[in-house]
Amino acid sequence: DQALLDVVVIGGDTMEDILRGYRDLTGYPSMPPLWSFGVWMSRMTYFSANEVDEICDRMRAEHYPCDVIHLDTGWFRTDWLCEWKFNEERFPDPKGFIGRLKKNGYRVSLWQLPYVAENAEQIDEARANDYIAPLTKQQATDGSNFSALDYAGTIDFTYPKATEWYKG
């Protein structure tokens, strides 16, 4: 017989003592990369690779510090529908685009959602392989403005194959 639940109580005189005990048990976090503490540039969205290139070139020309350029939903094929694919009309060469930014000293952050929409290209594959946990309409609308997108489910990151699929 195996126990269904292990209960661990960590005591200490101060909160730091308790946290140290917790970290001793679970492990200490690694330090994020230095660039992640730097300056991030973003706005509601950029709508093309040309627009991003112009802004990034100007920041370098005018000696503004910037480590990360963040692209909001404008990189999507359909605004607000996260399918993890670039709109190739506005971003015709995604690899080249990101390569240019990296060469110019930028890291690139892309806005994403861990949901799959009913009309997303990936929905059939996600359902067939149990990569998503079903999402009720109530769950999709509670405190969110994404209900109009008709999300079918959230990616089940507790399932290793779903995590690998998402990374791919």
Residue ranges and their predicted role:
Residues D1-P33, R43-M44, C56-A61:
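Catalytic and substrate-binding clefts that recognize carbohydrates or anionic sugar/phosphate headgroups
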